[in-house]
Amino acid sequence: MEKKETKNDAEKNNKQDNKSTKSQKKENLNLVNSDKKITELENEISNLKDLYLRKQAEFENFRKRLEKEKDNFVKFANETIMKDVVNFLDNLERAINSSRKSKDFDNLLTGISMIENEILSIFDKKYNLKKFGENGENFDPSRHEAISIEEKEDLKNPEIVEVYQKGYCYNDRILRTAKVKVAQSKN
């Protein structure tokens, strides 16, 4: 009977060894799979860190480029208007040189008036800069500054009788009010 028990014990031990070996193999397989997964995740983290750093560098380069473009825009924003001003200066120089030769005041006055009209016309058309403040206009305190006042008979509305300095507006925004003398009714 002892032989049977020993045989049974041996079979039981053999079965337990098989279970134990299978369990160890399974654990080893799980460890290998876990190690592979850890390696994959570490690689993915490394790739994401690298991508993050590259995107951060790209963004910094973009920000610097945008700042440089903004600086250039501000620096050269008035280039078009400066080209027009240079043309006006050329015309003034021609008028002055011509009047030095001929000593003709009337021609100088005509030339300067033509240059003024050219300047006002180009500034109006290209830049929407308008001059205002004429004799006979109704006085508007938002557009005109009354430097002096005189009284007149039978005026319905205060009006401009003399302009000391013209006013200018740019895109409907007042740059400078016109400085004027205003007539108002005595009544």
Swiss-Prot record:
GO terms under cellular component: cytoplasm
Q: Which UniProt keywords apply?
A: Chaperone, Cytoplasm, Stress response
Where does the protein end up? Answer: Cytoplasm
Its chief place of residence is cytoplasm
What is one process in the GO biological process aspect for this record?
A: protein folding
Residue spans crossing the bilayer: none
Disordered: annotated span: 1-31
The terms under GO molecular function for this entry are: adenyl-nucleotide exchange factor activity; protein homodimerization activity; protein-folding chaperone binding; unfolded protein binding
- Spell out the family assignment given in the record's similarity comment: Belongs to the GrpE family.
Q: How does it assemble?
A: Homodimer.
NCBIfam families found in the cross-reference section: PRK14140.1 (NF010738)
What this chain does, per the entry, is described as: Participates actively in the response to hyperosmotic and heat shock by preventing the aggregation of stress-denatured proteins, in association with DnaK and GrpE. It is the nucleotide exchange factor for DnaK and may function as a thermosensor. Unfolded proteins bind initially to DnaJ; upon interaction with the DnaJ-bound protein, DnaK hydrolyzes its bound ATP, resulting in the formation of a stable complex. GrpE releases ADP from DnaK; ATP binding to DnaK triggers the release of the substrate protein, thus completing the reaction cycle.
According to UniProt, the name of this protein is Protein GrpE
Q: Which gene encodes it?
A: grpE
